[in-house]
């Protein structure tokens, strides 16, 4: 409870919008579970809400520049991604800016070989995503009842992925395209 409250307060102070987490559960060294997650955008609309976000991660591998996600399980997720004019900013850009370094930094020399990322299993249940982009004229709403897969190969560097089976159920996508609005029209 204490960790959840500190994380929520820190995030709210950093990004300046409402952040709510009903429960945080960490089982070292592997599992992080968030339940009752809510994140508001600067217009006080829902940016992200979720019943359960569970990530099974090999935390000790982080010490050797490796992110190994054994299982990602998302349930009851709603995400609203919106881009508007005149600034053509997304409704989550303020979060990126809040965590970005305020001082310019010199390009570090890459001597580590980079961070490797691997994903084993993904399970998604009751996912709703709204993408409303006034700049490109795309308005997409998607609902996914269920999706799960297990990767045999996951190579982000080469964009090479192999999965023997994908289970997909209850996919409903609505796309509305309008003429893209140029900045000059504003």
Name the predicted role of every residue range.
Residues 17, 36-186:
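Secondary-structure transition motifs
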Residues 13-38:
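Short extracytoplasmic
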């Amino acid at each position: 409870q204490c960790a959840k409250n500190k994380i929520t307060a820190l995030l709210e102070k950093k990004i300046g919008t409402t952040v709510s987490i009903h429960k945080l559960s960490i089982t070292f060294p592997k599992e992080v579970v968030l339940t009752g997650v809510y994140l508001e955008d600067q217009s006080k609309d829902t940016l992200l809400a979720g019943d359960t976000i569970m990530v099974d991660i090999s935390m000790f591998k982080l010490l050797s520049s490796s992110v190994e996600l054994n299982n990602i399980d998302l349930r009851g997720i709603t995400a609203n991604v919106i881009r508007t004019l005149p600034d053509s900013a997304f409704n989550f850009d303020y979060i990126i800016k809040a965590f970005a370094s305020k001082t310019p930094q010199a390009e570090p020399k890459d001597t580590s070989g980079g961070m490797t990322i691997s994903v084993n299993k993904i399970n998604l249940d009751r996912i709703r995503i709204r993408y409303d982009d006034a700049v490109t004229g795309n308005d997409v709403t998607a609902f996914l009842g269920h999706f799960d897969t297990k990767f045999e190969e996951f190579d982000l560097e080469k964009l090479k992925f192999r999965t023997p089976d994908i289970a997909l159920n209850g996919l409903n996508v609505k796309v509305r395209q309008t003429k893209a609005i140029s900045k000059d029209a504003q």
